[in-house]
C-alpha cells in the first residue's frame, strides 16, 4: 500500500503488524498523516496481511473507516521489500509486533541495512519490539550501543496478558547491553540517539514522528 505519490519526495517505509493483536489506530493515524506530508509512503506487513486496528475511538473511527476505502489500503508484503529503496523507516505502536515483527527475518534484513547506512528509523510504543529482530550472526543486537525507550514494565503489567507476553522490550534492551529509559506510565517520552528515534507509548507518537521528520530534513 502506497500513499499518493509525489515526485521528488523521499520514500518512507511504514511497517505494521499483521497479527490479530493489531495496530494502534491513533498511533497509525498520526504516523501516516504526519509522514505523508514529507514522504512517499509505503505500508508493509508480514505476508501483506490486512491490519487490525485496535483502540478505535469516536475521534478516529471515521478516519479508520475512510482509510480502509482508499485505493492504497492493501499493505505490501514485507518479505518483498528492498530496504535500499527507502530513506526512512517508521513503525507505529502495534501490540501485534510482539507476535510477528519481533521475530521477522525480513524486517531484520531491512533494519540491518538501515543501521549500516545510518538511515533514520522511528519506532513507537509496542512497535519498538520490532527492533528486537535485528540480531547479528553472533546473536548480538545491532542496536546494543544505543539509548532508547519503549513500553515500560510498569505500563505492561497493567494488561491482563502480561504473563503470556513473548517478549518484554525493557528486559530485552537491557539484556542486550543497550540503555533503556522510561518515564511514568502513559507519559510522553521520546529518545533520539543518532539516527534512531523511539517513543515510549502511543501517546508519544507525534513528537517521535516530528523527530523523524527533523532527522530527515537535516540530511538534505
Swiss-Prot record:
It is found in: Secreted; Early endosome. Belongs to the peptidase C56 family. Residues 1-38 form the signal peptide. Component of the FERRY complex (Five-subunit Endosomal Rab5 and RNA/ribosome intermediary). The FERRY complex directly interacts with mRNAs and RAB5A, and functions as a RAB5A effector involved in the localization and the distribution of specific mRNAs most likely by mediating their endosomal transport. The complex recruits mRNAs and ribosomes to early endosomes through direct mRNA-interaction. GO terms for molecular function: glyoxalase III activity. Keywords: Endosome, Glycoprotein, Secreted, Signal. GO terms for cellular component: cytoplasm; early endosome; extracellular exosome. It comes from the Eukaryota. The lineage of its organism: Eukaryota, Metazoa, Chordata, Craniata, Vertebrata. Its main location: secreted. InterPro entries: Class_I_gatase-like (IPR029062), Prot/Nucl_acid_deglycase (IPR050325). This is Glutamine amidotransferase-like class 1 domain-containing protein 1. It comes from Homo sapiens (Human). The keyword Secreted applies. Glycans are attached at residue 201. GO terms for biological process: methylglyoxal catabolic process to D-lactate via S-lactoyl-glutathione. Homotetramer. Component of the FERRY complex composed of five subunits, TBCK, PPP1R21, FERRY3, CRYZL1 and GATD1 with a ratio of 1:2:1:2:4, respectively. The keyword Phosphoprotein does not apply.
